[in-house]
C-alpha cells in the first residue's frame, strides 16, 4: 500500500468557526484513505477531544493528534492577532495546552510555550501572507518561520478567499517562495486542507452558517474539504512530482511521528461504558 498523508488541521462542529462535521466524520474519512493519523485543531477550544478519543478508542488503527488553533501578537494590546497551531507531543504536552487555553488563547507570548512537549505550526494564510503582500524580503519571512516547527500550505484556490489574490500563477510563486524559506530555516513545509468539512458538498452547509454569523463574503469560500492523499498530491503537482510528495506525504508523516504513543487507549477491553471511557481520558490527560 502506498504511504498516505496526514492532515494536521481539521476544525470540528465543537468549535466556533462554522465547521459542519464532528470528529467521527473526520476520523472515518481519514481511515477510508488509510491515513495513519489526524490532528484535531479547533479554534480556541478543545471540546472535541473527548469525543475524538472515544472514536479512536472504538475504531483503532489511527493515531489521534490533539491540537488547537490559537493566536499570538506583538503589541501590548495585541491589536493584530495572528493564528498558529499547537500540537501536543504527549500527555505532558496536552496538559500544557490546557494551561495555555485556560490562561487565555490570545494574550500569551510564543516564548512561554513549552517546546519540549508541544509542536508549533503556522499557516501560510496568516502573518506570512500579509508580510509578503507588504513586501517583506526572505530574511524577514525567515524570522517569522524560524519560530515554528512547520508551515501549512494550502491549495491555490484558498488564496482568493484569505488574501484576494486571484492570480493563480502569483499564488503558486508565493507558495514556492515559502517552501524555499522553510527549507533554509529547517522548518517543514506541509500541505494541509485546514478542513472545515469532510465532503465537498458540505460547503453549502458551511456557507449558510457563515451567512448566519454575518460573514460578508461567505459565497466566496474555497473548497475547504478533507482531501484524500491523491487529491492533495494533485493540488500541488505544479511543484513537480517529488516535491509534491515531500510536502504532502513525507513531511506530514514526520510531524505525526513526533507524537509519541502515550495517547493509546488503555481501555481496549469490551464492556466499558462511554462515561467510563471519557472519565479515563480526563484522568490520564490531566494528572
Show where each model-derived region lies.
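Phosphodiester-processing cores and adjacent nucleic acid-binding clamps
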Residues: 1-287
Amino acid at each position: 500500500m502506498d504511504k498516505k498523508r496526514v492532515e494536521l488541521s481539521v476544525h470540528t462542529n465543537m468549535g466556533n468557526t462554522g465547521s459542519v462535521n464532528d470528529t467521527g466524520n473526520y476520523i472515518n474519512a481519514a481511515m477510508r484513505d488509510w491515513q495513519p493519523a489526524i490532528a484535531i485543531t479547533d479554534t480556541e477550544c478543545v471540546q472535541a477531544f473527548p469525543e475524538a478519543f472515544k472514536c479512536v478508542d472504538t475504531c483503532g488503527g489511527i493515531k489521534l493528534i490533539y491540537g488547537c488553533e490559537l493566536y499570538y501578537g506583538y503589541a501590548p494590546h495585541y491589536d493584530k492577532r495572528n493564528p498558529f497551531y499547537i500540537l501536543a507531543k504527549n500527555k505532558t504536552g496536552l496538559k500544557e495546552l490546557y494551561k495555555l487555553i485556560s490562561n487565555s488563547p490570545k494574550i500569551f507570548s510564543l516564548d512561554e510555550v513549552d517546546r519540549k512537549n508541544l509542536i508549533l505550526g503556522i499557516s501560510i494564510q496568516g502573518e506570512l501572507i500579509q508580510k509578503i503582500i507588504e513586501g517583506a524580503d526572505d530574511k524577514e519571512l525567515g524570522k517569522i518561520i524560524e519560530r515554528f516547527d512547520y508551515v501549512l500550505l494550502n491549495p491555490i484556490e484558498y488564496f482568493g478567499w484569505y488574501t484576494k489574490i486571484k492570480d493563480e500563477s502569483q499564488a503558486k510563486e508565493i507558495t514556492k517562495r515559502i517552501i524555499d524559506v522553510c527549507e533554509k530555516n529547517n522548518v517543514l513545509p506541509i500541505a494541509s486542507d485546514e478542513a472545515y468539512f469532510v465532503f465537498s458538498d458540505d460547503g453549502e452547509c458551511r456557507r449558510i452558517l457563515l451567512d448566519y454569523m454575518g460573514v460578508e463574503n461567505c459565497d466566496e469560500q474555497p473548497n475547504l474539504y478533507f482531501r484524500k492523499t491523491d487529491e492533495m498530491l494533485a493540488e500541488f503537482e505544479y511543484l513537480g512530482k517529488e516535491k509534491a510528495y515531500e510536502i504532502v506525504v513525507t513531511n506530514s508523516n514526520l510531524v505525526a511521528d513526533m507524537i509519541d504513543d502515550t495517547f493509546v487507549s488503555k481501555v481496549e477491553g469490551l464492556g466499558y461504558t462511554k462515561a467510563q471511557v471519557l472519565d479515563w481520558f480526563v484522568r490520564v490527560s490531566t494528572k
